[in-house]
């Protein structure tokens, strides 16, 4: 499917509400087993208002068609308030917008989809990210900001093509951006009981498994 501007507008307005409901101001801890040395490590991913525009592949423009920079918060609020006009945006000229729009709805279920994470291998000319997470049909590119990662690009692509060392995700937990401890378990690898695995002390200090119940295979 090739998106028209009307299609794009409809999709980004709809997905903005889903983003607000499912991901906005949430923080995820991705606990994984490093493929190269078998060590258990983690990354944290946070979702802000300002990250949403990057995921759409759209650019805000002025009345003369000039791209407006540093308007990501404005873009998101226009989407939430259904105030994004067709003349207010354009598709990026590098051709990535169609790919991003196709992947955007899938992103909202990122915690259900993610089975693998790894360092990005720079195989795509227009994808500038540090890490990737996802599965066989979807990949979320992550950019590092200080000690956490933020979402910057989503693609309908097998993650194993985008990382040279795909590492198994053991668990994903979620918390509010201002909450101290991760206590909501969103995903656990099939057959894994988190109560029976020895996690590094650093990770143990960040999570609370009091409400976790092993569901079996």
Protein language model regions, located:
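An acidic, glycine-rich, mixed-charge low-complexity segment common to nucleic-acid enzymes
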Residues: 1-126, 130, 174-217
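Compact beta-sheet-dominated globular domain cores
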Residues: 135-190
């Amino acid at each position: 499917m090739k998106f028209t501007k009307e299609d794009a507008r409809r999709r980004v307005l709809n997905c903005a509400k889903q983003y607000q409901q499912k991901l906005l101001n949430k923080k995820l801890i991705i606990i994984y087993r490093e493929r190269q040395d078998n060590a258990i490590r983690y990354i944290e991913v946070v979702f802000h208002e300002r990250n949403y525009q990057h995921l759409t592949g759209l650019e805000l423009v002025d009345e003369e068609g000039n791209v407006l920079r540093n308007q990501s918060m404005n873009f998101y609020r226009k989407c939430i308030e259904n105030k994004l006009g067709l003349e207010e945006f354009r598709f990026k000229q590098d051709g990535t917008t169609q790919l991003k729009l196709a992947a955007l709805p899938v992103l909202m279920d990122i915690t259900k989809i993610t089975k693998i994470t790894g360092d990005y291998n720079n195989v795509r000319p227009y994808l500038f990210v540090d890490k990737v997470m996802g599965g066989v049909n979807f990949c979320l590119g992550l950019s590092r900001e200080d000690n956490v990662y933020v979402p910057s690009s989503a693609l309908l692509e097998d993650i194993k093509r985008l990382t040279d060392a795909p590492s198994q995700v053991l668990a994903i937990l979620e918390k509010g951006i201002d909450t101290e401890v991760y206590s909501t378990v969103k995903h656990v690898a099939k057959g894994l009981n988190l109560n029976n695995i020895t996690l590094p002390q650093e990770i143990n200090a960040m999570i609370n498994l009091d409400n976790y119940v092993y569901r079996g295979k």
